[in-house]
Structures are given as structure tokens and as C-alpha cells.
């Protein structure tokens, strides 16, 4: 370990806030991409429960028949043209990231309606990747403290 004077340590800590903000921004973007990728992956495949989000119900026979009638596969839940999947985006704020869609259909599917059971692909994706996000954010704080001398690998599972 390198010896550091008290003054050197104070200078190191003074730069910590700036490094933390920089690392936090990078980490939030990385975490948002992880959740966005997972949410897109879930479209078209039945999902089990994840935290407070229930497992997806089987599509109704009438829905399957309608899908086939319109030229789509019978049983790929939430996937028709791919437009809803492609609408999943993220935005970054100062200390937060938001992953979502501006599609009304995405809202109806995520939250459910009177006639459509909720099939959470955003909340479910966030729950399934929470451990990866926690690791990304934790590593970013460590990187800010120790600086670029040490690189810590982050798992993706």
C-alpha cells in the first residue's frame, strides 16, 4: 500500500465527490441498460413471479386465435410486431435512472386493465436484475474511493 500524508489524504477525499458523481453516472447508465435489456428479452416469453410481480397468466384462447388470425404466432405473450419491445428506453437524471416506455399498450400490459391481466415486464425485469444493479452501484462507489488503479469485474447474471 502506498504511504499517504494527511494532506495527500485530504486531497484524495476532496476529489472523491467528483469521482463519485462521475462513477455514479456511469453506473446508473450501466444499470439502466441491464434492466432495459432484460425487459426487452422478456417480451414474447412467459415470465415467472418476481418479487411483488405475479407470474404471467397464459394468453386466453380468444387472444391466441386473434393473434393467428392477424398473422402472428399464437403464444408469444406481449410480442406482435416488436414495436412495444422496441419502445423500451431509459433516461438518466442527476441521481436516478428511469426505464420505461411511452407506449399506452406497454402501460396496459405492465399494470393490467379490467380485461387484461398485468404482465409486468419492466418491474419484473428490475426485480430479476436487482442483484446485478446493486453490484454495479456498489462497485462504482468503491471505484470512486480507490480511483482507477483497481478494476472490479461485475457479473451479469
Question: In which residue ranges do the predicted regions lie?
Answer:
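Short, Lys/Arg-rich flexible segments
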Residues: 1-157
Amino acid at each position: 500500500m502506498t504511504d499517504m500524508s494527511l494532506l495527500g489524504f485530504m486531497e484524495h477525499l476532496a476529489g472523491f465527490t467528483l469521482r463519485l458523481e462521475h462513477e455514479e453516472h456511469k453506473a446508473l447508465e450501466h444499470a439502466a441498460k441491464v434492466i432495459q435489456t432484460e425487459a426487452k428479452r422478456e417480451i414474447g416469453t412467459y415470465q415467472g413471479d418476481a418479487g411483488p410481480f405475479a407470474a404471467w397468466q397464459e394468453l386466453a384462447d380468444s387472444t391466441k386465435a386473434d393473434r393467428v388470425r392477424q398473422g402472428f404466432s399464437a403464444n408469444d405473450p406481449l410480442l406482435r410486431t416488436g414495436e412495444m419491445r422496441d419502445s423500451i428506453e431509459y433516461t438518466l437524471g442527476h441521481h436516478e435512472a428511469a426505464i420505461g416506455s411511452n407506449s399506452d399498450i406497454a402501460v396496459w400490459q405492465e399494470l393490467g386493465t379490467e380485461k387484461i391481466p398485468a404482465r409486468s415486464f419492466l418491474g419484473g425485469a428490475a426485480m430479476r436484475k436487482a442483484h446485478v444493479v446493486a453490484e454495479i452501484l456498489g462497485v462504482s462507489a468503491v471505484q470512486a474511493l480507490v480511483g482507477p488503479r483497481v478494476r472490479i469485474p461485475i457479473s451479469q447474471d
